[in-house]
Amino acid sequence: MSGKCRKIMYALVVTVFAAFLWMICCENDRKVSDKAIGETTVQSMRSGEKSVSLEQSDIPKIEIEDLTDAFTVILQYASKDMLAGCTVDESFLMWFYAQYGRDAVIHIAFDVLDGGNDPDVWYEETGNSIHVLWLLYCRDSGFGQHELENVYWMQTAAASEMVFGFAGDINFAENWYTTEYMKEQPDGLWDCFSEDLLAQMQGVDVMIMNNEFTYVNKKGATSVYGKAYTFRADPQKAELLEIFGTDTVTLANNHVYDYGKRGLLSTLDALDQEGIPYSGAGRNLKDASKIIYYVMNGRKVAFVSATQIERSKQYTKAATETEPGVLKALHPEKFLKIVEEAAQNSDYVIAEVHWGTEGMLYPDQSQRHLAEQIAQAGADVIIGGHPHRLQGAAFVGDVPIAYSLGNFWFSTGTLYTTLSKVTITEDGTVKLSFVPCIQQNLTTRILTEPEERSDFYEYLASISADIGIDVDGVVYHKSADDYPAEEILYDSDTSRTDIIGIADNEGDAIDIVGNLKEDR
């Protein structure tokens, strides 16, 4: 039997089973007792009542006597926000009933009648958000299989939180400083990072790296004419990403097209060979624009990325309907629509953007403006890169921003860098934190000495805007109502309007990409 036939047969079985359950429900579950609907429902019922009548301004008087009534309430009166855009119908509700039981259905219906229409009620009842429930339904029923594309089901280290890790620029390019140093080490790339740093990277639930070069064989490869820096790595080096515990890479940068169309396609092939999903570039615009979804702890998290660079000379080609390239955000309308789509189809959105100006300590006006647009489009946190310097943190409303993670392992200069973590807690709080690191002598390590750590966080606070930093490197918005002033160790007293630009070149000793000028 073909795969298509199997899907059709499976769908028929599910439909018949749903109809069978429906008849059972109507025959045997006519009344909803106090015990069945639980204490919360009992509070809304008068003692001895056989049904519940609630009246809302926009909902007629409804009596829930059985599951048919409950289904009617949900299907007719649940808000779009509560259903989160999912095409919930009787088939979905029968599947939901089969999985979670009558009480869960009744509680959902009463939330609608109570005027709550809170999408979190699905998670509270089942441990899965409506977005995850919809994916499970599609997976089990055989319907809406396109919904399962680019969805990755992940295991978390802790049931109470989801942790994403992000690092700045890395470079495996041939004849580049980092790669030449790696070749000299007994254990190669392992010797280029401290053990505790690699352990933390491998320990997060999802590790996302910025692939700031292209994978293509030397034979026949031609770099883009006129570009000052072009980076090419042997495709076999893609396997090195495993050392970082890499789950996804962003290709939305200004070097993935250094060797033209051939180089980009070779890069995509190399990542496909390693089974590593990529974002922000692709074989066409659809591929470059795809949203990656992670399902963990009953929540669905979206990841999107784009590049604002280059601004003048367009060495890096934008993807089109038929041609490979990157997803550009210099004119951000397309990217903002993707962020909006991600927000509509997930519980949280993480956006990563290649932006800013090389060598700058502070974000420029274009970064700030784009950050505001991305936040308004629905992102819950924004991660930045490209300036080859660690830039500070800030907030747009309640959306935390890491403007630039800097060079993670890219250059010869001594520069602060970080492993940035995005933690989503069980109660839905999104936290951005920074692990203090330094790139020095072509090796990157965590700063472990108390004085070193203090210096790092004081520096981070000094280049940030309107934030406080606690002992764990978590940043907080000083204007937030729940700002934990008593827990703050490092305080930024700088207004985000006070600082723009300012190069960090250590007295002109380091160039804009982070190399010591004496090494060139």
Feature names for model-found ranges:
Residues 1-47, 53:
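Gram-positive cell-envelope targeting signals
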Residues 38, 64-68, 119, 144, ...:
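Short amphipathic alpha-helical segments that mediate assembly, nucleic-acid/protein binding
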Residues 9, 25, 38, 60-63, ...:
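Residues marking helix boundaries in flexible regions
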Residues 85-151:
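Pan-zinc metallopeptidase signature
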Residues 43, 48-83:
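Zinc-dependent metallopeptidase catalytic helix centered on the HExxH motif
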Residues 66-91, 274-293:
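A charged, solvent-exposed segment within the mature domains of Sec-exported extracytoplasmic proteins
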Residues 149-520:
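Acidic, metal/ion-coordinating pockets
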